[in-house]
Amino acid sequence: MTQFTQNTAMPSSLWQYWRGLSGWNFYFLVKFGLLWAGYLNFHPLLNLVFAAFLLMPLPRYSLHRLRHWIALPIGFALFWHDTWLPGPESIMSQGSQVAGFSTDYLIDLVTRFINWQMIGAIFVLLVAWLFLSQWIRITVFVVAILLWLNVLTLAGPSFSLWPAGQPTTTVTTTGGNAAATVAATGGAPVVGDMPAQTAPPTTANLNAWLNNFYNAEAKRKSTFPSSLPADAQPFELLVINICSLSWSDIEAAGLMSHPLWSHFDIEFKNFNSATSYSGPAAIRLLRASCGQTSHTNLYQPANNDCYLFDNLSKLGFTQHLMMGHNGQFGGFLKEVRENGGMQSELMDQTNLPVILLGFDGSPVYDDTAVLNRWLDVTEKDKNSRSATFYNTLPLHDGNHYPGVSKTADYKARAQKFFDELDAFFTELEKSGRKVMVVVVPEHGGALKGDRMQVSGLRDIPSPSITDVPVGVKFFGMKAPHQGAPIVIEQPSSFLAISDLVVRVLDGKIFTEDNVDWKKLTSGLPQTAPVSENSNAVVIQYQDKPYVRLNGGDWVPYPQ
């Protein structure tokens, strides 16, 4: 009888060590809710392993309590890993820059992460869990959902749920001088200027496509002449590189109908800035004469043919460098010189009026004053050919008026900048000077934010940040363009700007009786939308955006 009692007691003694997930149920329920709303880059297997660690039976209650203490930092790290927030590598790489932010700006950034609707929903979920857990074993449902999510992703990354045999849409475009046929470039099919997108969007296929893209881009460059023709007409090139301006920002600010946009001769409607940070953006623009390179290669020496302003210097254009700020934050001026090949002295900033203070407290100069100084300086040049790079940041997040800690209203700043630029255009027209002005934003300001990033955060170069308005205007022409701007809809990037400059190098566009605008703007290089920062890559594949963080799996960008 005694032996029988011991045998039946053994199973019950094992069951008593299965204590369930307890409070960790709420942790997983919150994750499921955020996942359902599209706010997480959820990793099913890691979460299942974490749940198994929490469920593993331990005979001693002290060990059970110790496990909970150990699980706290693990759970926090896993939650962070499941979000779209910047990873440790990004935070470390940007640490010195974050340290330069003013206290008021840091507080402003932190408050943007507070979503009261989300907090309210989590509170309701907490009450529901506390109520239902009195009668229902929530752990069973949590484990079942985790298992289901893992089954869904056995064949690929999270949310890559396309069947292997599903038909896909092939993106076929023609650009540059390419024919509308598939050609072989490094063993990969290429349609026009861009690698073909025929394979299903799995992680392996997207990685292969990205490698093919960079291999194809490495073979592209603008062809500058060795010298200008004897009858070439001198003119000036002014490239205005404005920070924090995208089509999404303009729409959010309600300035799509500003008259400035109707005054350009040429307008790029589908231009990709390829990054969401200032330093890399400036380097890409200054290296516009070669195809797009990876973020890492931006900080490696490039072929001499890649530097747009250096190419112009060889043809007799005098270089000028202007900034609407001091260029010190993040070593911006140093990057422009070392990686962008811009060796010209910074134009004198003495006595320029300060209209704003940056997020780090540095001065932001009045654009009208800077542009007027450019007019004065270049007018005194002995050389009538010049190429000027002007970087300005009146729209940067965190800019505020002197004596005021609150970030200045974006719409008011954008309205002022557009008005000033429009007035400058009028002044240039009156001057009679032959000038080609190219307005190229660095990147957008993330004015609206999305499910991955709050307003102002640009760690991930999303399409709404990198789709920027680019405009070209010619002044001093004998036969100026009439009517609405010529709109270029094809996917473009910096190589198209370089090619456009090459097409007008002889300056005859300013003296011709009739300008063939169609010939000037047709067949410019197309570039597939690929954007990259140090820890994030975003591509457009089969008309859908995909993102890869820290070299992990590709997932669809949350819409």
UniProtKB/Swiss-Prot annotation:
Membrane-protein topology: Multi-pass membrane protein
Keyword field contains Thylakoid: no
Pfam families xref list: CBP_BcsG
Summary of the knockout phenotype: When the bcsEFG operon is disrupted in a cellulose-synthesizing strain (a strain K12 / W3110 derivative called AR3110 with a restored, functional bcsQ gene), cellulose is no longer made.
UniProtKB keywords: Cell inner membrane, Cell membrane, Cellulose biosynthesis, Membrane, Transmembrane, Transmembrane helix
Major localization class: membrane
Chain segments annotated as transmembrane: 34-54, 68-88, 113-133, 138-158
Subcellular location: Cell inner membrane
Top-level lineage group: Bacteria
Residue ranges of coiled coil: none
Other comment: Cellulose production is abolished in E.coli K12 / MG1655 and W3110 due to a premature stop codon in bcsQ.
Protein name per its UniProtKB record: Cellulose biosynthesis protein BcsG
Organism (species): Escherichia coli (strain K12)
